[in-house]
Amino acid sequence: MAMEKDLLLTCDAGTTGCKCTVFDARGEAVCSVRRSYPTSYPRPNWSEQDPQLIVEAVFGCIRELLQQVSPQRIACVGLDGTMNGCIPVDENGTVLHPNIIHSDTRTEKQVNEIAGVISQKDFYRLTGNRIDTHYTLPKILWIKENLPEVYRKTRWWLNTKDYLYGRLTGRFGYTDYSDASLTIALDINNRRWATELLQDLGVDAQRMPRLLAGHDVKGRITRDVYHATGLITGTPVAIGGGDGACTARGAGVYLPGSGYTYIGSSAWVSQITPAPVFDEEARIFNYLDMDGVSYHVCGTVQCGAAAFDWTLKNLLGGDDGMMEISRVENMARQIKPGAEGVLFLPTLMGSRTPYWDANTRGALMGFTLYHDQRHIARAIYEGIAFALNSCAEIMTECGAPIRSMMLTGGGARSGLWPDMLASIYGLETRVHKSPGETTSLGAAIAAGVGVGMFKTYEEAAGVVASRSSHPVNPVWQEAYAKYYPLYKGIYQQIKPTIDGIAALGL
């Protein structure tokens, strides 16, 4: 008797490693396996990964998972991965150069070349994004100019999960709408490649991958993959989406005004909208959802929990190295909102939303001999929360206020951030039931829609649950209404000094 195909298997290809998870039809994680892989930094500002090592890690995870569940129960495989990458492959899917990943910023020259062809304003209206070094299009230009033989042989420009899709199914040259958007080579208004822009830049639009919705099931597991992993030949594979799009779906976001906050090494605030949300100052950005219909509007804090971790290690560690997070939270709770005047600007890796200034440095200010580690701890939490609020505030200014908020990512495990964010946002904030599984759950939802386990993304949102709800604290809210404007003023006050430091080549 054949087993019921009642499970979904997801492959999440992240920056530091991959995680493969099996979900049931209720959105519950049945089992999960992680493996790491390296990032190389061959020169300053360069960040690369070997796609083959990612595939080996994913295949290894799948083999381990299938020791715990029968492969005959897997109804579909769903994928997600880091966005903004650049993997050139030939017509056979052979990798021609390591993946130039999202954190690579070698392309200042190419960014200026794009800006010479189209104004920043027109580019933003066309693609929903700024011209910036983190995205794929400048990386394609860099390869064209510096590795002409690689460019000549390239048939497709892929992101991480697109390459993985090709290796699983034998079908290379596909991407979904979310990853396509953050190549910054897509006309997001018309949902097609920006062929005129590409032509003006001398880039062959025919080498951009074909567009699929994340739930489209056009590929199936090959016999070679069966031998490598144990997945049954012919098992459907949904291409899924970029990690940002999958996180939104895994957070249950599908209605306008319903948003989420993600706190990981970086952090962001996002919501799904029926149309792009444009800001006159281009402080927020847009990309298509993996469904190919809806849009995500997003504001990103470049250094989220990474700023918190740096502070723990370097300012709050004492003689024994990094202080326990629970102890830091207890310290921070002893201090009133506003940290009695201590303020923190968490721009330790430059800034995206709202300043978009790569030279920006972090700042900790307002302390005196009276203040101690408890004030610093409180200020760090508040600085990151204030930075996230600036993202939500811009959306409100643009006519797209968030009315409900889900918190996810590693920061959602904090006992302090949910209360703090609720009072700073002025919005009841829920914490995701499984904050570490949100992105993978989004990939599972796409796969489930693809094989009919869920009729629609909206129906699938019903499997998303929260574990706690945090109301606005009126006393905290009143205090933050006084301190947030002071926080917002820091950047402009210190910018001349920051620019002076940058002029020294530091």
Each model region followed by its residue ranges:
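Extracytoplasmic/secreted proteins and extracellular or luminal domains
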Residues: 67-70, 204, 398
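A conserved helix-loop-beta module that forms one wall/lid of the active-site cleft
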Residues: 201-213
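Active-site core segments that coordinate phosphate-bearing ligands/cofactors
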Residues: 2, 8-10, 108, 115-129, ...
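Short beta-strand-loop/turn "lid" adjacent to the catalytic site in phosphate-handling enzymes
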Residues: 63-102, 130-136, 165-187, 210-213, ...
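Residue-level signal for inorganic ion chemistry
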Residues: 27, 50, 77, 104, ...
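Short, function-defining helix-loop hinge/capping sites that tune catalysis or transport
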Residues: 20, 58, 88, 98, ...
